[in-house]
Amino acid sequence: MKKILFFAVALMSFVAIGCEKDYSPSPTTRADFQQAYPDAVDVEWEREHGHIVAEFKLPGVSNDCEAWFKKDGTWVLTTYDIKVSELPEAVLNAFQSEYGAATPIDGVEYIEKSNGDKQYVIEFETFEASGEIDVFLSYSPDGKLLNQWVNIYYDYIYDLL
């Protein structure tokens, strides 16, 4: 029984290390965030895989945003969940020419990076003999395919950091 309890506690510790909710960032990081996003509401801070993440809403822009910072507080990127109708025409055309207009899109994110790059990530599902697969495609605003990730367990955000 003690072994089971030990392994349960150890497993929960590993999960807690991966994503620490209710994190309080440094005053400098918090001030930089507030200056960049003065209209942000419902801000929650956490640590995720060594990064500081602010989850927030921007009224009139997106109800699901994340600003990612390095450990030292340097801003890396911000993601905004957006509607398919907000995709640039070039991005939607590139997606539909490759996958068809009838392919349902599960989600779209607009991403701004600290180096000035902007991109859109489209998520959709496809079915193969092995089962259902989540596909993530990253496009530049002019519709160029930048990257793709295929796996239900893979989080593309770590490649962007």
Q: Which ranges hold each PLM region?
A:
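Positively charged n-region of N-terminal signal peptides that target proteins for export
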Residues: 1-4
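Short, flexible loop motifs at catalytic/binding sites
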Residues: 7
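Repetitive helical segments and hydrophobic/amphipathic motifs
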Residues: 11-12
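C-terminal motif of bacterial Sec signal peptides marking the signal peptidase cleavage site
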Residues: 15-18
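First exposed extracellular module after export/assembly in secreted or surface-exposed proteins
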Residues: 26-161
